[in-house]
C-alpha cells in the first residue's frame, strides 16, 4: 500500500531486507514500519550507514529513543519517529492538549485490531504525555477494528470527547509524505511526532 502511493508521489521504494544482497547503496531514506522487536536494530543499521530514517513502528521506549538520538547525531543524520502517521491522529493529539488546559480530567480509550502487538498503543502513550497528571489508558483488541482512539474529558456537568478513527491504512500515507518532505530540513538526531511538522 505504501509503495504505490510513494511511487505516485515520485519516490522509489526498495525493499532492502528482501533483496538477495542487502545494500544501502543509492538509498536516500529508510522507512521502517516493521515490528517492535525489529525496529531498533533496523534503524541502527540505517543510521550506521548514514541513511536518514522515518520510523512508524510502535515499541520504542525512552532508552531506545535516546540511543537512536545519540547515534543519529553522531552520524549527522535526521531520524523522524511518529507514533501515528495519520494527520487526523496528530490533530487529535494537538486538540487534546489544548482541551486539557481547560478540562484537566481525562481518560484515553484506544481500540485496535486483534493482531496489534503493543497495548497501550504508541499513540495513546504519546497523547497521555501531552495531558496533565497520570491519565488512565484503556486498550481494546478485537477483530473488525483497525485503529481508533478517543480522549474523554470530564468537567462540571459536561464531557468532551475528541476521537480519531483510522478506517484504512491509506490514512498513514499523507503523514509519511509529509515526513519525507521535511526530513532534509530536520536537525541531526531524533525528532518525535507528526504534530511537530504541522504548521
Positions of predicted regions on the chain:
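C-terminal substrate-binding/catalytic lobe of Rossmann-fold NAD(P)-dependent oxidoreductases
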Residues: 1-24, 37, 101-199
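Short acidic/histidine-rich motifs immediately flanking catalytic phosphotransfer sites
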Residues: 23-31, 47-53
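Glycine/charged-rich beta-loop-alpha catalytic/anionic-binding loops adjacent to active sites
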Residues: 27, 51-52, 73-81, 155-162
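Glycine- and other small-residue-rich loops at beta-strand/loop junctions that grip anionic moieties
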Residues: 31, 57-58, 84, 116, ...
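Conserved NAD(P)H cofactor-binding loop of Rossmann-fold oxidoreductase domains
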Residues: 34
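Rossmann-fold NAD(P)-binding glycine/threonine-rich loop
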Residues: 37, 41-44, 48-49, 57-81, ...
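Short beta-strand and adjoining strand-loop segment in the mid-core
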Residues: 85, 96, 113-117
Amino acid at each position: 500500500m505504501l509503495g504505490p502511493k510513494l511511487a505516485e508521489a515520485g519516490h522509489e521504494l526498495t525493499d532492502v531486507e528482501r533483496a538477495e544482497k542487502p545494500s544501502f547503496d543509492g538509498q536516500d531514506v529508510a522507512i521502517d514500519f516493521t515490528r517492535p522487536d525489529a525496529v531498533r536494530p533496523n534503524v541502527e543499521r540505517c543510521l550506521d550507514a548514514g541513511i536518514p530514517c522515518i520510523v512508524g513502528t510502535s515499541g520504542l521506549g525512552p532508552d531506545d529513543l535516546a540511543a537512536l538520538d545519540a547515534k543519529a547525531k553522531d552520524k549527522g543524520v535526521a531520524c523522524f519517529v511518529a507514533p501515528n502517521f495519520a494527520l487526523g491522529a496528530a490533530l487529535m493529539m494537538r486538540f487534546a492538549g489544548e482541551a486539557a488546559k481547560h478540562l484537566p480530567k481525562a481518560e484515553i480509550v484506544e481500540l485496535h485490531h486483534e493482531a496489534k502487538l503493543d497495548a497501550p498503543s504508541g499513540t495513546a502513550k504519546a497523547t497521555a504525555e501531552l495531558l496533565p497528571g497520570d491519565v488512565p489508558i484503556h486498550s481494546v483488541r478485537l477483530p473488525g477494528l483497525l485503529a481508533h482512539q478517543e480522549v474523554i474529558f470530564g468537567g462540571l456537568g459536561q464531557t468532551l470527547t475528541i476521537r480519531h478513527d483510522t478506517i484504512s491504512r491509506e490514512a498513514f500515507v499523507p503523514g509519511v509524505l509529509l515526513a519525507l518532505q521535511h526530513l532534509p530540513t530536520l536537525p541531526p538526531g531524533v525528532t518525535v511526532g507528526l504534530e511537530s511538522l504541522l504548521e
